Amino acid sequence: MGVARRVRQRSPLAGAARAPPVRLGRRPGLGFSGDLLLTPDFPTRPEPPVPVAISACLTGQAVRYDGSDAADALPDADLAAVFDYEPICPEMGIGMGVPRAPIRLVGEGDGLRVVSAHDPNLDVTDALSAFGRAQAVRLDSICGYIFMTRSPSCGLASVKVRSEVQGEPYRTDGQGLYAASLLAARPGLPAEENERLFDPAVRGGFINRVLTYAHWRRLEADGLTAERLIEFHSRYKYLLMAHSIGHYRAAGRLLSDLRGRVAKIGKRYLACLMEGLAQPAGRSGHANALSHMHGHLKRRLTISETADLVAAIERCRTGAAPVGDACAELLHALKRHPDAYLGAQTYFAAVRFL
């Protein structure tokens, strides 16, 4: 059965005229360092636990078709302290009981259907799709979703899709219909399959995407403006750089001109940020981000401090030492030479999960 899991109590989260592009610089009432506008009331990055929906069988609920659960199919020891779970079983949600006949994906393209494995005339396609759309609205406060691997309702990828022609081989490129419906209604929502979360890099990346999404929701609730969108990016730029230099550059281009388009650009920025953070942050990515942060600080460092930091970053790049060592060296330098811009970087809070 696995360790006990925290199941959350549901609680909600908290067309403009054309204007000149937002230019970063000194503004009355705002502290400024580098290219970051430091506003004292900027929403803080949420601390765990954060609300996350999850396939109910993964929490120990005996809701699978045969009356079993899948509690051991999740690395819960590393997740229980970070997430508050909202368990959902779409099959139970549409009125299928336990035990029940298993369901399967059949067909191709727009004709994809979900039917009973015992009776192909029992079609739950529309019911699962509608349930997904409804849950996307009901679960407005969630900041991520953990789906059951290869499930015809919940799988994100590699789900078996059977041909409606008897004897034809099945494909393994399907997506669960409930998951597809819900995620289409919640673009940007971090989602991952349970089995992939046993990979430490995937697990850490997912945790950070969830926390980032939660931070974004706070920003939206507080009111998205051009200045706040730029400040949000400024705080995440080195974390995004560590994960994907391509997405880092794309995000910068998106924010180069926000005239009267903050809401529209904000949606595109979130998609770019989530896609970028979904890329693995390798040693070279970390070393690149750390080197850029060193470049921001280097004029204040002594020759000895510079040598120590450069050597630590190079050991990170080559794998001779963990990323945390180089990060610690940079934090020591920041303690001796405080810098508001680097001190506001999300990278330092995120790297503990990577």
Short names for language-model regions:
Residues T59-G67:
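Short N-terminal binding/cap micro-motifs at the start of the first secondary-structure element
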Residues V137-L219:
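Internal, conserved structured core segments that host functional sites
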Residues S68-Y85:
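Short catalytic helix/loop segments, enriched in acidic residues and glycine
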Residues P120-L139:
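Glycine-rich anion/phosphate-binding loops
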Residues P87-G111:
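Short, surface-exposed acidic-centric catalytic microdomains
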Residues P190-L354:
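Acidic, Ser/Pro/Thr-rich low-complexity regulatory regions
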Residues M1-L30:
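Compositionally biased, low-complexity flexible segments
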Residues S55-A56, C89, I146-R150:
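Short beta-strand segments
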